[in-house]
């Protein structure tokens, strides 16, 4: 059985990208050709602008169109005590769930002043979050007064450049507290080149929660409690997937968030004895080696943190030894890691279950 230690690696800290490159598609792309099971993976160093040459006419790229909220607030209690609030999810026009960092957890009924601009009232606890009641439309107040919640490994305060570059060019539906980072590499030129090549495009929405940065704290992966996120698949997307399958094309997920939404919906549909259909749901899917993929054939993704659930996901998809070889190469070749870093293009290995853990 695989354990947490199987997904550890040493990363020189200087390879953690702290800022975005001047041009989105100037990032590097490591194409991993693992289609020959009897040979080591072929690792091809490219620029992201070359992605259209790596995919075929008739393929389908599936993007996550979530938009990152300015979800971080600094504020104070009525007593003057300092607090930090991270909005996790907007659940109603004037209601949100949030994490609150304070010297003492505020009880229901407490008034908090955020950004010296407005007050919220603490409602019931929905573990591990607090319910916050806003005086007006949540999304408007968050956009007007909040701060962009950069990942914990990015050391600078968010600036004007981050407000542009920590969003995808196709972001449309506000609700995430972290960017779907594989999408950050796509610019208008790359999207136009994909269209000219005859590659189809579709979108889904998965609002990325702060749990994406949650460390795995148990050595036995079966004991890990995965965070839950909301997602939506439309009829248009489901129809495009069916059409892609019918013409022999490949479904390519842009990012692990797109992957998780597609695979969660397909798994649940299969369990219910029905075909994939439009849906709006919650998922806490935890993909580890041994998982049987139902929808996605290829994956565009960034380089992930050691011991992270996302590293486990890509290992399940492409094979543990393939990912280990690719990461060794990326470190030796000085690729940039994590949210503002470079990308990989992976292909599903149907024999990727080199070791198994609770597949389904």
From Swiss-Prot:
Reaction equation(s) it catalyzes: 7-aminomethyl-7-carbaguanosine(34) in tRNA + S-adenosyl-L-methionine = epoxyqueuosine(34) in tRNA + adenine + L-methionine + 2 H(+)
SUPFAM superfamilies: QueA-like
The encoding gene: queA
Keyword Transferase: yes
InterPro entries named in the record: QueA, QueA_dom1, QueA_dom2, QueA_sf
Protein's pathway: tRNA modification; tRNA-queuosine biosynthesis
An example Gene Ontology biological process: queuosine biosynthetic process
Family per similarity comment: Belongs to the QueA family.
Broad class of where this protein is predominantly found: cytoplasm
The enzyme's E.C. designation: 2.4.99.17
Highest rank taxon of the organism: Bacteria
Compartment(s): Cytoplasm
Protein name as catalogued: S-adenosylmethionine:tRNA ribosyltransferase-isomerase
Job of this protein: Transfers and isomerizes the ribose moiety from AdoMet to the 7-aminomethyl group of 7-deazaguanine (preQ1-tRNA) to give epoxyqueuosine (oQ-tRNA).
Subunit organization: Monomer.
Record keyword Transferase present: yes
Molecular function in Gene Ontology: S-adenosylmethionine:tRNA ribosyltransferase-isomerase activity
